Amino acid sequence: MTSKVGVIGLGIMGGAMARNLLADGIEVAGYDPAPAATAEFRDSGGTLASSPFEVGRAADLVLISVASSAALQEVVTGGEGLDGAGRPGLVVIEASTLPLIDKEVARAALAERGAAMIDCPISGTGAQAVARDLVFLASGDADSVAAARPLLERLGRSVKEVGPFGAGSKVKYVANLLVSIYNVATAEAMVLAVRAGLDPAMVFDVLYDSAATSRIFQLRAPFMVEGVYEPATAKISMFVKDLDVIGSFANSLSCPTPLLAAIRPIY
C-alpha cells in the first residue's frame, strides 16, 4: 500500500477512517472546510492540506467522504479541485452516498487527466467506522479496486467487489432502504414492549438471536434500552438525504417502494 493516503471530508465517517490510518502509522493528508473537523484531524497527527488539489498532489490513493453532490463537484472540479492533480496512477475512492449521475461526472473529469475513480460506498455507522466494522461496496475497474483494497481492508471488516462503476451505489441504495425500515421497525417494537410493561433489557436479550433479530436491531436497540443516544453515530440530515437519493433512484426505475414512502415522514 502507498505510504501516504489522502482523505477529503473529515466528518463522522471520513474523520474516523483518517484517525484509524494515523493510528496505524500511515501518513494522511486531509482536507475539510469545517474547522472543527480539521482541528481533530490535526491533533491526531494528520497533515492538513489547504485544498483537494494539494491532497491529490500528496497521495496516490485519495478517499472522498462528503455530504452532498455540490461538495463532490467542488472537491473534484472546483477552483483548487482534485482534477488538477489528476494523473495516471492516482486512484480516487468515492465513498459517499450520492446520486450516481454526479459520481459519473466526477469520474469523467478525473479520467480526462488519467486518474481513476472507483465507486465505493460504505455500509456502516460512525461508531462502526471507529471500530473498523465497515463493509465497503467497491465497484469499478478491477485494477483500481485492487489498488484500493489494502487500504479498505485496514478500515473495515469486509470489501465486497460488486461489479462495474456504479454497482456499489446501487447496492448501497438497496442496503439503506432496508436499514431505514429496520430502524423504524426496531423503535416501534421497543416502544410496544415498554408500553406492555416488559423490561426492555429482557426483550433485547430474548430477541437478539431470535427470528426477529437484525443487524440494525442489534446495533440500535441497546440505545433504546439504556435511553442514551450520545455520542451520535450519524446525522439525521444525512440519513434523510440518503432516503431522498434512494427514492429518486427507485422512481427513475418505476420501482414501487411503499415501505420507504411510509417511513420517510418519520425521519
Regions found by a protein language model. Give the residues of each.
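Rossmann-fold dinucleotide-binding core
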Residues: V5, L10, L98-N176
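NAD(P)+-binding Rossmann beta1-loop-alpha1 motif at the extreme N-terminus of oxidoreductases
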Residues: M1-I64, G126
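Helical "substrate-binding/catalytic lid" subdomain
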Residues: A167-Y267
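Rossmann-fold NAD(P) dinucleotide-binding segment
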Residues: P52-M117
